[in-house]
Swiss-Prot record:
Protein name in UniProt: Photosystem I P700 chlorophyll a apoprotein A2
Organism: Oltmannsiellopsis viridis (Marine flagellate)
Top enzyme category: oxidoreductase
Comment on bound cofactor: P700 is a chlorophyll a/chlorophyll a' dimer, A0 is one or more chlorophyll a, A1 is one or both phylloquinones and FX is a shared 4Fe-4S iron-sulfur center.
Membrane-spanning segments: 46-69, 135-158, 175-199, 273-291, 330-353, 369-395, 417-439, 517-535, 575-596, 643-665, 707-727
Amino acid sequence: MATKFPKFSQGLAQDPTTRRIWFGIATAHDFESHDGMTEENLYQKIFASHFGQLAIIFLWTSGNLFHVAWQGNFEQWIKDPLHIRPIAHAIWDPHFGQPAVEAFTRGGASGPVNIATSGVYQWWYTIGMRTNQELYTASVFLSLMAGVFLFAGWLHLQPKFQPSLSWFKNAESRLNHHLSGLFGVSSLAWTGHLVHVAIPAARGQRVGWDNFLTTLPHPEGLTPFFTGNWAAYAANPDSANHIFGTSAGAGTAILTFLGGFHPQTQSLWLTDIAHHHLAIAVVFIIAGHQYRTNFGIGHSMREILDAHTPPAGGLGAGHKGLFDTVNNSLHFQLGLALASVGTICSMVAQHIYSLPPYAFLAQDYTAQAALYTHHQYIAGFIMCGAFAHGAIFFIRDYDPEQNKGNVLARILDHKEAIISHLSWVSLFLGFHTLGLYVHNDVMQAFGTPEKQILIEPVFAQWIQAAQGKALYGFDFLLSSSASPAYSASQSVWLPGWLDAINSNNNSLFLTIGPGDFLVHHAIALGLHTTTLILVKGALDARGSKLMPDKKDFGYSFPCDGPGRGGTCDISAWDAFYLAVFWMLNTIGWVTFYFHWKHLGIWQGNVSQFNESSTYLMGWLRDYLWLNSSQLINGYNPNGMNSLGVWSWAFLLAHLIYATGFMFLISWRGYWQELIETLVWSHERTPLASLVRWRDKPVALSIVQARLVGLVHFSVGYVLTYGSFLIASTSSKFG
């Protein structure tokens, strides 16, 4: 008899109910729980899967390149990046009538196309690509690389090529390779590409495989490097009237510190970016060589951590025992990695609009809005994952004996103080922020808007002034020509930076007022509440006052009856589940704020945000309702336009979102009754009764139904806002 799914769990494979299928899918990636899994095999499986992950990323990027080269308008877009819409790919749909064909035929194309809102055109243009042929070449190269990585993944699963457990746990060697190799050398290589290919291309000089070894990126070659005259590489930068992609106004500098933006492209100076990557390379290559590997010199991570003991004795054992705790727990390591990547992802969202690195990206408003929203939502999901794996660490990997008295144990010991403080902050922020908003709404409703409580964000304005924003009149640090900070950099990067920060045609340090003050605190409420739920879930994962033996029940468990006081909604998984709703809520406020604020700036009408953002009806009426009208009329009884697809996606997203509630509100008994009824009717229906199944149908567990609900809620939520965002922005700016 054929073995049933799942092969990795004989217990589940023999389950006579449909639970076998759903639990099999749910635990497919929980390698630790699989039959016969050893620690060494676990590490090897995860290591090999990384190659598959890289192959997928390369194939995906390859597909982007290929479709733009085949069906896009890259070469036309380069000639006029501000007025030609970049095409992502063609669309072929048998349902299109003539109006749809005409509506979606854009960007100089001969048939229906999708417009790219991801900024890839600007990225490829900035790094030196100029022709479709180069896009094809890159696409083929990445496809081949994907094949190489798939082979490498397979190879590392073969017994001869499987790394040993000691190899995976050699922390110092890993730091050496990751810091020096992954970050350092790749940054150096990228600096090389920018200096040898991208900067010449920005000055109208083509460098390809045929001439890159003979074309000097700087007139003096390597002479200044070897003679110590490094300043030569910063001399003669591009002038303020440089036209990107041509030699008009171009200089010869390759590594500069100009500050600010290129006046034409409104992006960072490429020579500044090259300088930045070179500095990163030097720092990381040195950093990666600090640790003791083969030669008996350098730091030992274990010694460093064990030495970190607060001297007075009042703070316990410090970092003692942490080396083994971290090094032996994949969940701890994954939690740290996810927390770092989540933070970085959110930072990318902030920086890609405030300091745009790619030429002309700042003027592609739809791409700006899409990139910001995309990175903030991804950051939110990743950060929630960090706490989920932190909780799993406490349940599966934490050893109280090994961590006696250290910082980890002490955090668990005073978790009540941490949780209650977060709770207090959340309550304070919630009541005060909502109180201010509601007061202002009442004043608007009663016709006395002058009685609103409007608070200027003076501390934030002071911080902006310290960076050089002169508008507020604070005479401080970079806003004061008498300060040492001002004079120290006056001859280097400061003129460019001050021009940028005091200019009204970019997004650097936007002017802020009472509306910003309120929404800032609303976002702070969301962040603190999300953090409260996640931190409580992780710190209570092993046990709480109500359920001291929680760790024996694992990460996710359903209700355990009234006998123990009721254990519904207290597993670490439940905390993750609840936190995702708050995370989505928070990112919603963040993206609303970003988008509405920028719509005003891009349209030259900042007063609308300033006046309407101080009360809730302003947000609902002047942001959401006002900007959804074009979207909702993408198709109606009179016809359709190019927003029709987003109107449809908007509707679809609402349906997905609503489906989520069906799973979230009903409990297990409902599903069991529903399934029994369906089975009964199925078995009594002609023809349908011929189809039998071996597994006895049982309802979703509470946890499963909640997961299904959560996924539908999340997907619907993000897709609803995504379609609103792209439609409302592109309808205004093309």
